[in-house]
Amino acid sequence: MAKTQRLDIVTPEKVVFSEEIDFVVAPGADGELGILPEHAPLVTALKVGTLRVQQGGKFFKVAVSGGFMEVKNSRIVVLADTAERADQIDVERAKAAKQRAEQRLNSKGSEIDVHRAEIALHKAINRIKAAE
């Protein structure tokens, strides 16, 4: 039987996922990281992106919006600001959020927080891509 590792994806609101998996690719702050069972211990920041998880020969995606990942003793803990399985993403809601962020960025008002609007746009695009 193939070796597996535990993956726990946790947000401030809930445990999104907590099961044995085969492999995960995570959006590390310095690039993507592939984690197999018995990986060397590691702690890294995560950027907005998509976790790609292989479990039992099948793949699924989880959209994350930053956080941290710890790998130790064939256990992976992802502490994410937000996390949403691709099959649970409301694509229409994500598209609406993308449109709102684009409208904010295109407006010329001084009350617009450009950095915040850019982050919102990036998160919305990530959710849409993860759901595809």
From Swiss-Prot:
Q: Name one GO molecular function term.
A: ATP binding
Give the UniProt subcellular location, in the record's own words. Answer: Cell membrane
Q: Does the keyword Ion transport apply?
A: yes
Q: What Pfam families does the annotation carry?
A: ATP-synt_DE, ATP-synt_DE_N
The protein's matches in InterPro entries, at most eight in alphabetical order, are given as:
ATP_F1_dsu/esu_C_sf, ATP_synth_F1_dsu/esu, ATP_synth_F1_dsu/esu_N, ATP_synth_F1_esu_C, ATPsynth_dsu/esu_N
Q: Could you tell me the keywords of this UniProt record?
A: ATP synthesis, Cell membrane, CF(1), Hydrogen ion transport, Ion transport, Membrane, Transport
Record function comment: Produces ATP from ADP in the presence of a proton gradient across the membrane.
Instruction: State how it assembles.
Output: F-type ATPases have 2 components, CF(1) - the catalytic core - and CF(0) - the membrane proton channel. CF(1) has five subunits: alpha(3), beta(3), gamma(1), delta(1), epsilon(1). CF(0) has three main subunits: a, b and c.
Give the family per the record: Belongs to the ATPase epsilon chain family.
Name by which UniProt lists this protein: ATP synthase epsilon chain
Please report the organism this UniProt entry assigns to the protein: Desulforamulus reducens (strain ATCC BAA-1160 / DSM 100696 / MI-1) (Desulfotomaculum reducens)
Q: Give the lineage.
A: Bacteria, Bacillati, Bacillota, Clostridia, Eubacteriales
